Amino acid sequence: MADTLMSDIPFWQRKTLDEMTDAEWESLCDGCGQCCLHKLMDEDTDEIYFTNVACRQLNIKTCQCRHYERRFEFEPDCIKLTRENLPDFEWLPMTCAYRLLAEGKPLPTWHPLLTGSKAAMHGERISVRHIAVKESEVRDWQDHILNKPSWAE
């Protein structure tokens, strides 16, 4: 009986991030694409600035990587989020499931694991499909900083 009750509880509520299988870990990603927007770092302060410039491999409409399994071949600078390096990614969005679960918080109501699709996430405008621009179309990256520092205004 206890095993049946445990299986009724979603894995993200009964397991720690470290206990999850690779498939469970991957399924936490809501597919918003925010990780796939380029970030700029101030050379003097190490402050990170977010842009709306999409990685060349990001399909802006679907918010999915065109070559996810081979992304490091196409984009050597692509960063893989793991259980081990999660604490280093302070820039993860406040809505990120990895961040939320690491902080002991629940998944948002629009998360695909709860709704069964990405439609609610896109509807809440969490995904980048409404703001992202193609890297090939960008001339001045500073014009695309979303959290502009005072010196850039």
Curated annotation (Swiss-Prot):
A Pfam family: CxxCxxCC
Signal peptide residues on this chain, from the entry's feature table: none
InterPro entries per record: Puta_zinc/iron-chelating_dom (IPR005358), UCP006173 (IPR008228)
Coiled coil: none
Superkingdom assignment: Bacteria
Family membership: Belongs to the UPF0260 family.
Name of the protein: UPF0260 protein YcgN
Species for this entry: Salmonella agona (strain SL483)
Higher taxonomy: Bacteria, Pseudomonadati, Pseudomonadota, Gammaproteobacteria, Enterobacterales
